[in-house]
């Protein structure tokens, strides 16, 4: 579905939300969901009248299998360049293991991951904080993983991966305790995001936060009062 002009959330993708941006200097994809989503994503691109061979980048907000699962499949089909933050690059390329999630969900991930059919891929582009790619700025937001990022256009849009949650009605929520490698760092990252200005927040899971999204995030943080318990640190 088209969320706003030239920004699509691809319907039916298993796993994390998968976004396609068709405007700007290059067409690009943000995250791919679980393994075996490749044909579904390609068919969506064709259905909206775009050519999959015009896909220039597949940008990973971080390295969990529900975000990177179909990267290798899509790279083979499209030859798009794969981009991920330097801290998560080893996981994508198979040189390091997926992050450890706490609790029963973590055990399920550990047992199921070998059966999911993930194929490692060496990234073409290593992302760093404040880099520009495809008309967006990379914002380093560690905590969920060590290499989590957001993609940001000032005053317009932010793709935030799993830096925070969103419910089915598009209300922002705090990061998951069990799914964050470092919850304190994750909270710092959300505070940093709240200092940016954007109208739409596009999460890795949940519904888009539309219309004054940065103000809604500030309102959420005002209730939580994290600034009092978590001192800011440089990323």
Cite the ranges covered by each PLM segment.
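Active-site HxH/HxHxD metal-binding segment of metal-dependent hydrolases
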Residues: 36-38, 46-125, 222, 226-227
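Short, flexible loop segments at the rims of nucleotide/cofactor-binding pockets, characterized by
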Residues: 6-10, 35, 58-61, 135-141, ...
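Glycine-rich phosphate-binding loop signature in dinucleotide/nucleotide-binding domains
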Residues: 48-53, 131-134, 195-196
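Core dinuclear metal-dependent hydrolase active-site scaffold
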Residues: 20, 126-153
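A structural micro-motif
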Residues: 5, 80-81, 136, 199
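Conserved beta-strand hairpin/beta-sheet module of binuclear metal-dependent hydrolase folds
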Residues: 1-48, 150-161, 166
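Metallo-beta-lactamase
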Residues: 35-36, 139-140, 146-224, 229-231
């Amino acid at each position: 579905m088209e969320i706003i002009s030239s920004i699509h959330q691809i319907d039916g993708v298993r796993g994390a939300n998968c976004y396609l941006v068709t405007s700007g200097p290059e067409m690009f994809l943000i995250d791919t969901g679980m393994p075996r989503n490749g044909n579904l994503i390609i068919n969506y691109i064709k259905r909206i009248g775009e050519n999959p061979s015009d896909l220039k980048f597949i940008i990973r907000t971080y390295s969990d299998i529900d975000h990177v699962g179909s990267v290798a499949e899509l790279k083979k089909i499209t030859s798009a360049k794969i981009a991920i933050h330097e801290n998560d690059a080893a996981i994508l390329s198979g040189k390091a293991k997926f992050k450890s999630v706490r609790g029963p969900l973590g055990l399920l991930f550990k047992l199921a991951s070998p059966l999911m059919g993930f194929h490692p891929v060496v990234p073409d582009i290593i992302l760093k904080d404040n880099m520009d790619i495809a008309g967006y700025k990379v914002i380093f937001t560690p905590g969920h993983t060590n290499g989590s990022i957001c993609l940001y256009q000032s005053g317009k849009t932010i793709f935030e991966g799993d830096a925070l949650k969103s419910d089915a009605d598009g209300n922002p929520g705090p990061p998951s305790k069990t799914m964050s490698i470092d919850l304190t760092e994750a909270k710092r990252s959300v505070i940093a995001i709240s200092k940016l200005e954007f109208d739409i927040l596009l999460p890795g899971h949940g519904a888009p936060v539309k219309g004054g999204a940065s103000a809604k995030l500030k309102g959420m943080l005002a209730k939580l009062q994290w600034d009092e318990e978590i001192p800011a640190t440089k990323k």
